[in-house]
Swiss-Prot record:
It is a peripheral membrane protein. This is NAD(P)H-quinone oxidoreductase subunit N. It catalyses: a plastoquinone + NADH + (n+1) H(+)(in) = a plastoquinol + NAD(+) + n H(+)(out); a plastoquinone + NADPH + (n+1) H(+)(in) = a plastoquinol + NADP(+) + n H(+)(out). Signal peptide: none annotated. NDH-1 shuttles electrons from an unknown electron donor, via FMN and iron-sulfur (Fe-S) centers, to quinones in the respiratory and/or the photosynthetic chain. The immediate electron acceptor for the enzyme in this species is believed to be plastoquinone. Couples the redox reaction to proton translocation, and thus conserves the redox energy in a proton gradient. Cyanobacterial NDH-1 also plays a role in inorganic carbon-concentration. One of its GO terms (cellular component) is plasma membrane-derived thylakoid membrane. The keyword DNA-binding does not apply.
């Protein structure tokens, strides 16, 4: 990776395609460097792991219920038949307030299924301010491609 990465080409590709698949060096550093460049360009950014994401669209944009771990305790007579359900706010709710562009970087995106990746692309097309970068694995140097191109192959 070059010593100085301006991120201009990355930002142009991100704005053109909306959802990118990234292969980053395993030693790290590329994601924070590019996120810093995006923040400098006016984006509001968030970095998350894709593990445990569930339904991406509901998790990111809608109020939804979660079931906390039971930790060996029984919940007889409390809550629903499926156990206690807690309501949580959408994870991108505070970022989508206002007019600023939003960039979401998902780590460990290789655990997501094809349909989940496709729903992330659809979410980017429905919400014009949202840009999603999914880290799909490691590589010796930083490279990226449109998510639609990855799903087509």
């Amino acid at each position: 990776m070059p010593l100085l990465l301006t991120g201009r080409t990355f930002r142009r590709d991100l704005e053109a395609h909306g959802c990118l698949a990234v292969h980053a060096p395993l030693e790290g550093g590329a994601e924070t460097r590019l996120l810093r460049r995006l923040r400098g360009a006016g984006y509001r950014t968030r970095l998350w792991s894709a593990r445990g994401l569930g339904d991406p669209e509901v998790f990111l944009t809608q109020k939804h219920g979660i079931r906390p771990p039971h930790l060996g305790h029984q919940s007889v007579g409390r809550g629903a038949a499926v156990g206690e359900v807690q309501e949580v706010v959408p994870q991108l709710g505070d970022l989508l307030d206002g007019d600023a562009q939003v960039a979401l970087w998902l780590l460990e995106g290789q655990v997501l299924s094809q349909s989940e990746l496709r729903s992330l692309c659809d979410l980017c097309s429905r919400e014009p301010r949202l840009r999603i970068i999914v880290e799909m694995g490691g590589a010796r140097s930083l490279r990226w491609q449109p998510m639609s191109g990855l799903l087509a192959s």
